[in-house]
């Protein structure tokens, strides 16, 4: 496949078609041209289409660089559809029970947990570095949801917002494609109410019983999820008295707990889950806190380096169009960097070391004292109790 030198430059669509034809040609085993030859031709066509790496102003799309196009050509990945690898329809018998607001997860009588039953099958190899990605906010926007389900690699996990409509259908579609799914748990952030986790969020101002009622409502939103992912929650998740009852409840349901809030710090929730021997993970890097091509690519590179250093790394992303595009591009080249993409469930219990019973009890006492001091510091000083100090001359 060659680029005719006299081709008109008036049609962007025609030039993009040339890009795609060249990329596909590189994956054709009968094509005599080398990948380098095709990369040079792609560079010429890319120059006609637009500035490499420049982001669109509206939809967050970018013009791929020649290097990216050549890499995609070698993989045969450009515009190749993801083939479904369906997971079993949910709910499965014996893995739910009636709650206050509908069916909620539970472990089966034979010991099978919802985590065991609903995670995506994956075999880890000892010594191989792995990265996992959770894309959040699924269900809130139908176009982005469709793109995430259909265009992302199946080993990328999807977290559904409890506030989305038609959640059972979204969950069914995601699992039918082959993605494992998680439920987002909205929790109070430090800057609440400036950052608003929504009307059913878990709040430090509520009594434990009310938060557990809200938790039941959240857990009943749809079936088939392998675990929960904290959303916001930088304040709620840092208070032992607030997060501990939630983790204990999640542990009883047999679900995985993923800390999706603290950008790499070992959260109290993940530590409590680890101490209970529940499956858990911690999001190390927020991939698209700044949703630009270059920033996303930089964060993904950081994630790969962290995986090479620590053995595993977990990224948290949102379902922006540019994020989905960059994730697909990045994942097609990941194996060449010596790192494999895994579902987040496959990395359970690999990041947080369980505390001994003595360590856990000491941490609990320290947390209780810290909360008590914080409450005293926040309380107004009492100057109206009728007592007065004796002033000595």
Question: Which role does the model predict for each range below?
Answer:
Residues 2-106:
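Juxtamembrane proline-rich low-complexity "stalk" or linker regions positioned immediately after a signal peptide
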Residues 110-195:
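Active-site beta->alpha N-cap acidic-glycine motif
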Residues 130-137, 199-209, 289-296:
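Active-site mouth loops of central-metabolism enzymes
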Residues 131-135, 156-160, 181-185, 228-230, ...:
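Hydrophobic faces of well-ordered beta-strands that scaffold small-molecule active sites
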Residues 163-168, 205-213:
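Glycine-rich anion/phosphate-binding loops
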Residues 208-297, 318-335, 339:
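Catalytic domains of cell-wall/extracellular-matrix polysaccharide-remodeling enzymes
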Residues 250-265, 269, 319-392:
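C-terminal domain-boundary segment and adjacent tail
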Residues 295-309:
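A short, acidic, amphipathic alpha-helical segment used as a generic capping/interface helix at domain edges
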């Amino acid at each position: 496949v060659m680029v005719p030198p006299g081709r008109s430059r008036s049609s962007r669509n025609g030039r993009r078609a040339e890009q795609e034809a060249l990329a596909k040609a590189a994956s054709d085993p009968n094509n005599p041209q080398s990948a380098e030859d095709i990369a040079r031709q792609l560079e010429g066509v890319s120059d006609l289409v637009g500035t490499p790496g420049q982001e669109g102003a509206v939809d967050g799309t970018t013009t791929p660089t020649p290097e990216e196009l050549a890499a995609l050509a070698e993989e045969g990945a450009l515009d190749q559809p993801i083939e479904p690898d369906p997971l079993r329809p949910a709910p499965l018998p014996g893995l739910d029970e009636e709650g206050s607001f509908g069916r909620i997860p539970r472990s089966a009588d034979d010991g099978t947990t919802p985590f065991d039953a609903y995670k995506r099958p994956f075999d880890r190899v000892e010594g191989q570095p792995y990265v996992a990605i959770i894309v959040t906010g699924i269900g809130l926007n139908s176009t982005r949801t469709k793109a995430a389900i259909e265009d992302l690699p199946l080993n990328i996990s999807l977290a559904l917002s409890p506030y989305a409509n038609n959640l059972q259908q979204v969950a069914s579609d995601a699992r039918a494609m082959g993605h494992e799914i998680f439920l987002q748990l909205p929790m109070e952030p430090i800057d609440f109410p400036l950052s608003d986790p929504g009307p059913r969020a878990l709040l430090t101002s509520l009594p434990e019983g009310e938060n557990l009622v809200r938790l039941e409502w959240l857990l009943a939103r749809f079936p088939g999820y392998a675990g929960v992912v904290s959303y916001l929650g930088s304040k709620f998740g840092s208070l032992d008295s607030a997060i501990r009852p939630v983790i204990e409840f999640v542990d009883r349901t047999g679900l995985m707990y993923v800390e999706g809030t603290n950008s790499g710090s070992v959260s109290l929730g993940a530590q409590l889950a680890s101490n209970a021997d529940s499956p858990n993970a911690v999001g190390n890097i927020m991939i698209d806190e700044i949703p630009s091509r270059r920033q996303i690519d930089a964060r993904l590179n950081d994630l790969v380096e962290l995986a090479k250093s620590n053995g595993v790394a977990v990224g948290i992303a949102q379902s922006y169009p540019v994020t989905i595009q960059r994730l697909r591009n990045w994942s097609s080249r990941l194996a060449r960097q010596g790192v494999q993409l895994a579902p987040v469930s496959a990395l359970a219990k690999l990041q947080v070391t369980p505390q001994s019973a003595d360590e856990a009890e000491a941490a609990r006492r320290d947390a209780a004292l810290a909360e008590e001091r914080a409450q005293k510091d926040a309380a107004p000083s009492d100057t109206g109790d009728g007592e007065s100090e004796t002033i000595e001359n």
